[in-house]
Amino acid sequence: MTKQPEDWLDDVPGDDIEDEDDEIIWVSKSEIKRDAEELKRLGAEIVDLGKNALDKIPLDADLRAAIELAQRIKMEGRRRQLQLIGKMLRQRDVEPIRQALDKLKNRHNQQVVLFHKLENLRDRLIDQGDDAIAEVLNLWPDADRQQLRTLIRNAKKEKEGNKPPKSARQIFQYLRELAENEE
C-alpha cells in the first residue's frame, strides 16, 4: 500500500477558490420582520405624501403606480397595498428614497436655520458696518455694496430714533434674496 502525501487534500481540482469572502451572515427572523415592518412604514410615509412631494422622490414606474393606487384605495385594500409596497421596497435600494424623504422633511428646519443665520448676519451688519459688509461680499460677490451701506445707515438712524426697524427688515429681505439666488 502506498502512502498518501500529507497535502493530498489540497490538490483537489477546483478547490483553489478562497472561501474567506463567502462568509454567511446569519440574520434572525425577528430582525428580518423588523426590517420588513420598517420598510412598510416607509412605504406608508410615501403614500401619505402629496403629488408635488412625490415627484421629488426617485421612484421607478412600478413602485410609483403601486403608490398612486394605494393613495386612491381605502380601508382593508389599502393595508394590503401597503404590504405590497413594502415588499417592492425590499427588492430595491431604498437609500435614495430615504434621502429624498429626509430632505423633504427637513426642508422646514433648514429654512429656519438659514433665517437665523441671516438674522445674525443682519445684526452684525448693523453693529459692525464695513467689516460685516466684507463678509457679505465674500459670501455673495454680486451683492450691491452701496445698497447695503445705505440700508445699514438708515437702520442705525431708525435704531437711534426708536423708530420701527423698516431698514433692518429690508436688509434681511435683501440677504434672503441673495441666499435664494445662490441656490
From Swiss-Prot:
Claim: RNA-binding is one of the keywords in the record = yes
Principal location listed in the UniProt entry: cytoplasm
One short Pfam name that applies is DarP
**UniProt entry keywords in alphabetical sequence:** Cytoplasm, Ribosome biogenesis, RNA-binding, rRNA-binding
Q: Which CDD domains does this UniProt record tie to the protein? A: YjgA-like (cd16331)
GO BP term (any one)? assembly of large subunit precursor of preribosome
Location in or out of the cell: Cytoplasm
Cite the InterPro entries for this sequence. Answer: DarP (IPR006839), DarP_sf (IPR023153)
Q: Which GO terms describe its molecular function?
A: ribosome binding; rRNA binding
Instruction: Tell me which Gene3D superfamilies the record gives.
Output: PSPTO4464-like domains
Instruction: Output the Gene Ontology cellular-component terms.
Output: cytosol
Q: Which PANTHER family match?
A: UPF0307 PROTEIN YJGA
Family of this protein:
Belongs to the DarP family.
Listed NCBIfam families: PRK05255.1-1
Matching HAMAP family, A to Z? DarP
| Chain's role | Member of a network of 50S ribosomal subunit biogenesis factors which assembles along the 30S-50S interface, preventing incorrect 23S rRNA structures from forming. Promotes peptidyl transferase center (PTC) maturation.
Which named protein is this? Dual-action ribosomal maturation protein DarP
List the taxonomic lineage: Bacteria, Pseudomonadati, Pseudomonadota, Gammaproteobacteria, Enterobacterales
